[in-house]
Amino acid sequence: MSSKLPTTLLRRPSALPSTTTYTAYSASRPTPPSCTAHGAQGQQIRNATFVPRHRRPYQFTQLVQLSDGSTFTVRTTMPTALYKSAKDSRNHLLWQPSDKSLKNVELDEAGKLAAFRERYGRGWDLDAKMTPEEEAAAAAALAAGGGAGVPGGKAAKKAAEEALLAKKKKEEEEAAKKAAEAEEADPFDSLTDLISGYATENMNPGLNFKETRHYGKKK
């Protein structure tokens, strides 16, 4: 005959707080004083306050090198010891007019400019006057670019066309210059021409508005 286990061992312990009261313990322990409304009002509460302070990050001593080679030191938060500035006021044509690296040199290694001029001419070039040395160098570069893989007759023809276009452009500039000088000499002539271009001839002189209106209706 098997023995029966007690039921208290098989019962799962509960997570809820026990409701059993111990009268002997509660009687011997003094009860805490209850907090009244008057006591809650009289108690002072001090909360923490934020005190604003200036942020002072750590700064490093940095050496700044400009494009012309000059250097100076600054205090900055960047930890880099040497900073090479590529954009500064000294890297400008007005500050360094004799610097060769700042000159606008035309590089046509792929031959795109030569192909454009061959198709559309030199009317899109800048109006800056070229020195004889630059003109000779441009003519030599054009001949070298046109002669590569092209017969000599074609290169000579292109050179002749370029010379003709340059001559025509020069003549147009001279004509425009003469016209501007003529306008500066007598500005009233140009104003008179402008007014006369918009003026209309009066076909019925000596008639007022009413007579002019009925002039065409007379038989």
Curated annotation (Swiss-Prot):
<feature type="compositionally biased region" description="Basic and acidic residues">
    <location>
        <begin position="210"/>
        <end position="219"/>
    </location>
</feature>
<keyword id="KW-0496">Mitochondrion</keyword>
<protein>
    <recommendedName>
        <fullName>Large ribosomal subunit protein bL31m</fullName>
    </recommendedName>
</protein>
<comment type="similarity">
    <text>Belongs to the bacterial ribosomal protein bL31 family. Highly divergent.</text>
</comment>
<dbReference type="Pfam" id="PF21492">
    <property type="entry name" value="bL31_N"/>
</dbReference>
<comment type="function">
    <text>Component of the mitochondrial ribosome (mitoribosome), a dedicated translation machinery responsible for the synthesis of mitochondrial genome-encoded proteins, including at least some of the essential transmembrane subunits of the mitochondrial respiratory chain. The mitoribosomes are attached to the mitochondrial inner membrane and translation products are cotranslationally integrated into the membrane.</text>
</comment>
<dbReference type="GO" id="GO:0003735">
    <property type="term" value="F:structural constituent of ribosome"/>
</dbReference>
<dbReference type="InterPro" id="IPR034600">
    <property type="entry name" value="Ribosomal_bL31m"/>
</dbReference>
<dbReference type="GO" id="GO:0032543">
    <property type="term" value="P:mitochondrial translation"/>
</dbReference>
<feature type="region of interest" description="Disordered">
    <location>
        <begin position="200"/>
        <end position="219"/>
    </location>
</feature>
<dbReference type="InterPro" id="IPR048874">
    <property type="entry name" value="Ribosomal_bL31m_N"/>
</dbReference>
<feature type="region of interest" description="Disordered">
    <location>
        <begin position="169"/>
        <end position="188"/>
    </location>
</feature>
<feature type="compositionally biased region" description="Basic and acidic residues">
    <location>
        <begin position="169"/>
        <end position="181"/>
    </location>
</feature>
<dbReference type="GO" id="GO:0005762">
    <property type="term" value="C:mitochondrial large ribosomal subunit"/>
</dbReference>
<comment type="subunit">
    <text>Component of the mitochondrial large ribosomal subunit (mt-LSU). Mature N.crassa 74S mitochondrial ribosomes consist of a small (37S) and a large (54S) subunit. The 37S small subunit contains a 16S ribosomal RNA (16S mt-rRNA) and 32 different proteins. The 54S large subunit contains a 23S rRNA (23S mt-rRNA) and 42 different proteins. bL31m bridges the mt-LSU central protuberance and the mt-SSU head.</text>
</comment>
